[in-house]
């Protein structure tokens, strides 16, 4: 269900009966003047056209809104007068940031996940390389012509030779270097030529992005799950660990700058708008600090139907406009989508998501982050086969699109590429949804070596907790400026996707 766009019109209410086209009451005494008036008007226009009009004025060309005589109140309410795309469709496809590299989880330090790049219409696998298991935190980065990814090795939670960080050529998949670790590597961040990595062995590494050599390493003594937040201009790195400790390092040398504490493990990592930093602890504790670590505000986020008892936070927050968007999970389903928006300035609650579109009755636990595009937030809904869009200002559901098989879990966060939402799902496939038409425009299967959908994919119960055939995708995709999409699979392959027409 899609809400209708409200239009303001200068035409007034519909014409009532007994009124003619001139808006006059249907009286005989007045009707006799109508035909002569039309004749006079026609003669006047003819005289202007042939005798008085400026013959040097431009003929043809593009008529802009500044040139048009149509009143701007005919535009959808709130539409920008100079946005032709918005005028035609009523939908904004704009990103709030300009990205040239995918240097962080969901592209940037705000985690909005939106980039302007060529879109794929006929997907193909450009290359496929075994790197080791790509879990929920093993989402790649793309900087220039290089792809960086952390690996959980051949078996998660155990020591093996595949644990570490890899660098690949974006176009060929050729390995450029490998940096080994003792246990699973988790999240990555990039800034000033340095890859920052976290891992299960409780260390934070600064690695030279050019050759994979170690620049610095610091030991926290407890697993670091989340994605490092790298503020490049400030040479600042912020990481969270399993004890809920937030630690800031100097990007260049790993020097300790400050530490803070939140309630519960920090699983998804921190987020920033470049001035403030927001960290969410698993036990609903959300802390905002400045770049010196000084506390700005701290709040406990409570979901409506849990009274704070069971709700937890796993995913990294998203900062967009004046909002900090938090997703949540619990042991049971939610009555409404499990998403809350806080005011960036003070942490007060702005909205909690509501399903006014009537999409479903039981909403699942969300372990992924949202992406932001135009006036929408988009994400993959668990306990479903749906991509869901919310109004960014109200948190109300706007629309949904079927994407693949019905699965209970959902881990990957989406990316938005020039109006296409790219989302991988637990069923092992990746999907593209056109925002303007609200339709799925392509899909591609990543859960096996052949790259073909299993024969039983469309059967009832194919996915549920795990696909009956093939492997899931838990990691989130990265998008290059040339339109390539890169993501890792639970089978252990890193896959680059392009368009067949690109050659």
Which sequence ranges carry the predicted segments?
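N-terminal Sec-pathway targeting helices
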Residues: 24-37
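Aromatic (tryptophan-biased) beta-strands that constitute blades/sheets of beta-rich domains
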Residues: 60-138, 148, 153, 158-166, ...
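Repeat-blade elements of multi-bladed beta-propeller folds
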Residues: 96-109, 133-165, 179-205, 218-247, ...
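Hydrophobic single-pass membrane-insertion segments
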Residues: 46-59
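Hydrophobic/aromatic beta-strand positions that recur at structurally equivalent sites within the blades
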Residues: 168, 207, 249, 288-289, ...
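Hydrophobic membrane-insertion alpha-helices, especially the h-region
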Residues: 34-47
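N-terminal intrinsically disordered, acidic low-complexity segments at the extreme N-terminus
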Residues: 1-19
């Amino acid at each position: 269900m899609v809400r209708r766009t409200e239009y303001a019109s200068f035409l007034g209410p519909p014409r009532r009966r007994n009124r003619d086209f001139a808006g006059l009451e249907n009286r005989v005494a007045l009707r006799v003047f109508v035909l002569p008036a039309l004749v006079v008007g026609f003669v006047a226009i003819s005289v202007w056209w042939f005798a008085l009009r400026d013959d040097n004025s431009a003929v043809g060309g593009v008529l802009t809104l500044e040139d048009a005589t149509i009143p701007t109140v005919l535009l959808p309410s709130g539409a920008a007068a100079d946005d032709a795309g918005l005028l035609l469709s009523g939908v904004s496809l704009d990103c709030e940031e300009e990205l040239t590299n995918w240097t962080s989880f969901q592209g940037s330090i705000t985690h909005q996940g939106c980039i302007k790049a060529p879109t794929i219409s006929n997907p193909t696998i450009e290359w496929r390389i075994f790197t080791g298991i790509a879990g929920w935190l093993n989402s790649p980065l793309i900087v220039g012509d290089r792809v960086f990814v952390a690996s959980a090795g051949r078996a998660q939670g155990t020591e093996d030779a595949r644990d570490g960080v890899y660098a690949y050529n974006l176009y060929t998949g050729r390995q450029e270097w490998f940096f080994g670790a003792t246990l699973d590597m988790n999240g990555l961040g990039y800034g000033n030529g340095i890859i920052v990595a976290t891992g299960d062995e409780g260390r934070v590494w600064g690695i030279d992005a050019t050759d994979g050599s170690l620049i610095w390493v610091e030991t926290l003594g407890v697993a670091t799950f989340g994605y490092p937040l790298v503020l490049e201009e400030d040479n600042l790195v912020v990481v969270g660990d399993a004890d809920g400790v937030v630690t800031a390092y100097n990007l260049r040398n790993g020097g300790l700058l400050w530490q803070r504490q939140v309630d519960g493990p920090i699983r998804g990592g921190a987020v920033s708008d470049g001035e403030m930093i927001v960290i969410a602890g698993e036990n609903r504790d959300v802390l905002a600090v400045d770049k010196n670590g000084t506390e700005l505000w701290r709040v406990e986020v409570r979901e409506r139907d849990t009274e704070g008892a069971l709700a937890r936070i796993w995913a990294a927050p998203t900062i967009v406009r004046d909002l900090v968007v938090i997703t949540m999970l619990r042991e049971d389903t939610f009555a409404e989508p499990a998403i809350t928006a806080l005011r960036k300035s003070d942490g007060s609650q702005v909205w909690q998501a509501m399903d006014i579109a009537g999409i479903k009755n039981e909403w699942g636990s969300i372990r992924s982050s949202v992406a932001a595009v135009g006036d929408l937030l988009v994400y993959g809904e668990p306990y479903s086969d749906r991509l869901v869009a919310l109004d960014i200002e109200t948190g109300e559901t706007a629309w949904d699109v079927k994407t693949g098989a019905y699965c209970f879990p959902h881990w990957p966060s989406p990316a938005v590429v020039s109006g296409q939402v790219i989302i991988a799902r637990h069923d092992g496939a990746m999907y593209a949804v056109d925002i303007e038409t609200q339709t799925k425009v392509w899909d591609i299967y990543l859960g096996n070596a052949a790259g073909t959908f299993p024969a039983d994919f469309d059967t009832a119960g194919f996915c549920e907790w795990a696909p009956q055939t093939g492997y899931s995708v838990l990691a989130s995709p990265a998008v290059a400026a040339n339109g390539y999409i890169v993501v890792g699979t639970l089978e252990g392959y890193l896959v680059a996707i392009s368009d067949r027409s690109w050659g």
